């Protein structure tokens, strides 16, 4: 069993590397790529890699099967491992894979092995539990979720955060979490469902910068851990310190063990930063360093000095300021659409030191996403992953829960309702306020109810893009601290929407449904195109720019692997692909 999971994970990352090479054109000029029947060949001089294609979707998205074969000067062999593929690419195809990138890819594979083992283990436990419960063996995932939610055994959203074993759908570094060991991956990654104790530390008030929607610097003590108020006061008193001179901050246990001592040893010695014996329980969300506090109505975004996918996941000081400031300034605007909410960020803080160290000791408090509605609330990324209850892809389980089955009618209705609930509010934010929320599948929470009733909540204001001129026209006194939120032009704001919603949300769902013979991919993208066209208000600002970019002949896509090879994670490398919703404007 373990070998099967290893082989499945290894092949998965091999396929992602090949897909990225084709899509991002990561090869020398003399390389020829051709498709012969169901086979794709990558030829460079006397070297040929061949792989079988099951299907291809928009935006150069392939689904492969079988081993990759390698023809080297007339001799054929099979590529058995990721390491073997990387060696061939490096030595025979002149595609430079650095030692660091090799390490990242292998770590992604090894973490994916652990994930697959965990998903198999969960499936075994669940089928055993069905034998001892009165639930039918073939219960639908949504019926099961409602059962456990009603019995207070689990919270549907938190559970769904653990149901994205594939992580990022196309990134070869989907599971990279360097320098974590596999034991640490099992302790802290969301798919392992572990309770994670966050350390409570105290910072002397003149050495911390707090920003609160309500102006309360003691937000964490007063609102999040009031049960510790007396214990913290007594603990500080035992050190000869006064609690009113300190502010609480939450720290991820990995960061506490590996990073805090390295960067803040002098502060700890001077009692500027105080470790305490107190912790608060949490579970990891899909973003790994954003934690859902157990039995508390909050999430907390924390720095973890580790590389997850392409970037090191620290927290920039300016996002701790802008989250609460934007939440306060825009709270009425952000929640004016029925069926579409934005999670407020009431509090943020960071250590008042140089920026590089401050990124390591900071936090943002976010309201826990909650949507009132029947059915189930899940993170959108889970929709295209299998669940361990009925072993179906979650969006398919939803259609079956509606008694619709997988038919042309049910799929087209779902895509239409999903797009109608998600796209018009996001385009209205761009036209009215110059803001594009980063509403990709990891950042959106969806409530799927009966009768195709669909509602959304977007979390994480930190990835937004803002056209300051448009926003200041509506909210004149707003100040943005974080330069990375401010777009160079309205075009960059629209591109953020296009990447998060058209490329990620809609293209991922359509790629999944594209495997069924009853629907055509182009029909589903036509539905998206119509919803977008209808959402653009010709009497409001930026209507022409929205049409030109969203319906243009090409779509700009991040070159995720290439930017890792060039080490340009912050300066995005882009490629142009055919736009699946292009039309004459």
From Swiss-Prot:
The keyword ATP-binding applies. It catalyses: N(5)-[(S)-citryl]-D-ornithine + citrate + ATP = staphyloferrin A + AMP + diphosphate + H(+). One of its GO terms (molecular function) is ATP binding. The keyword Transmembrane helix does not apply. Its EC number is 6.3.2.57. Pathway: Siderophore biosynthesis. It comes from the Bacteria. Gene3D superfamilies: 1.10.510.40. GO terms for biological process: siderophore biosynthetic process. Keywords: ATP-binding, Ligase, Nucleotide-binding. It is an enzyme of class 6 (ligase). Involved in the biosynthesis of the siderophore staphyloferrin A. Catalyzes the ATP-dependent condensation of a citryl-D-ornithine intermediate, produced by SfnaD, and citrate to form staphyloferrin A. Belongs to the IucA/IucC family. PANTHER family: L-2,3-DIAMINOPROPANOATE--CITRATE LIGASE, STAPHYLOFERRIN B SYNTHASE. This is Staphyloferrin A synthase. The lineage of its organism: Bacteria, Bacillati, Bacillota, Bacilli, Bacillales. The gene is sfnaB.
């Amino acid at each position: 069993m373990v070998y099967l999971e290893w082989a499945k994970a290894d092949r998965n990352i091999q396929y992602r590397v090949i897909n990225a090479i084709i899509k991002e054109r990561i090869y020398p000029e003399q390389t020829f790529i051709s498709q012969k029947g169901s086979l794709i060949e990558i030829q460079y001089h006397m070297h040929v890699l061949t792989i079988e294609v099951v299907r291809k979707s928009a935006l150069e998205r392939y689904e492969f099967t079988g081993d990759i074969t390698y023809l080297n000067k007339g001799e054929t062999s099979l590529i058995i491992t990721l390491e073997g593929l990387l060696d061939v690419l490096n030595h025979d195809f002149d595609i430079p894979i650095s030692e660091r990138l090799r390490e990242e890819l292998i770590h992604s594979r090894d973490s994916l092995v652990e994930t697959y083992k965990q998903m198999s283990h969960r499936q075994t436990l669940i089928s055993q539990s069905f034998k001892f419960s009165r639930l039918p063996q073939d219960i639908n995932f949504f019926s099961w979720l409602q059962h456990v939610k009603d019995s207070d055994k689990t919270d549907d959203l938190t559970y769904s955060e653990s149901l994205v074993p594939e992580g990022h759908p196309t990134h070869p570094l989907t599971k990279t979490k360097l320098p974590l060991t596999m034991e640490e991956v099992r302790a802290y990654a969301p798919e392992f469902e572990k309770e994670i104790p966050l350390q409570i530390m105290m910072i002397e008030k003149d050495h911390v910068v707090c920003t609160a929607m309500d102006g309360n610097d003691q937000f964490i003590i007063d609102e999040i851990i009031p049960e510790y108020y007396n214990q913290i006061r007594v603990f500080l008193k035992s050190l000869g310190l006064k609690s009113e001179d300190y502010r609480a901050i939450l720290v991820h246990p990995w960061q506490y063990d590996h990073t805090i001592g390295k960067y803040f040893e002098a502060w700890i010695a001077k009692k500027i930063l105080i470790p305490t014996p107190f912790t608060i329980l949490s579970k990891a969300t899909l973003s790994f360093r954003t934690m859902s506090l157990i039995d508390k109505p909050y999430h907390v975004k924390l720095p973890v000095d580790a590389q997850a996918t392409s970037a090191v996941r620290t927290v920039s000081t300016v996002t701790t300021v802008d989250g609460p400031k934007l939440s306060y300034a825009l709270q009425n605007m952000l929640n004016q659409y029925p069926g579409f909410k934005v999670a407020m960020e009431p509090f943020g803080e960071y250590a008042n030191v140089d920026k590089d160290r401050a990124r390591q000791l900071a936090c943002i408090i976010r309201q826990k996403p909650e949507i009132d509605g029947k059915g189930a609330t899940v993170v959108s990324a889970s929709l295209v992953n299998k669940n361990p209850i009925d072993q179906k892809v979650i969006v398919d389980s939803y259609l079956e829960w509606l008694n619709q089955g997988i038919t042309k009618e049910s799929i087209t209705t779902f895509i239409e309702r999903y797009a109608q609930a998600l796209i018009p509010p996001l385009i209205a934010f761009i036209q009215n306020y110059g803001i594009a929320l980063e509403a990709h599948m990891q950042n959106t929470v969806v409530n799927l109810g009966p009768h195709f009733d669909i509602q959304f909540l977007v979390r994480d204001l930190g990835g937004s893009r803002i056209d300051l001129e448009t926003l200041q026209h509506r909210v004149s006194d707003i100040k943005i601290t974080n330069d990375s939120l401010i777009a160079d032009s309205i075009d960059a704001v629209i591109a953020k929407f296009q990447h998060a919603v058209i490329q990620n949300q809609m293209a991922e769902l359509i790629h999944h449904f594209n495997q069924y013979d009853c629907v055509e991919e182009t029909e589903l993208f036509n539905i998206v195109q119509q919803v977008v066209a209808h959402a653009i208000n010709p009497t409001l600002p930026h209507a022409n720019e929205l049409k030109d970019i969203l319906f243009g002949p090409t779509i700009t896509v991040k070159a995720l692997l290439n930017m890792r090879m060039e080490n340009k994670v912050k300066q995005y490398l882009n490629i142009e692909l055919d736009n699946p919703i292009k039309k004459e404007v």
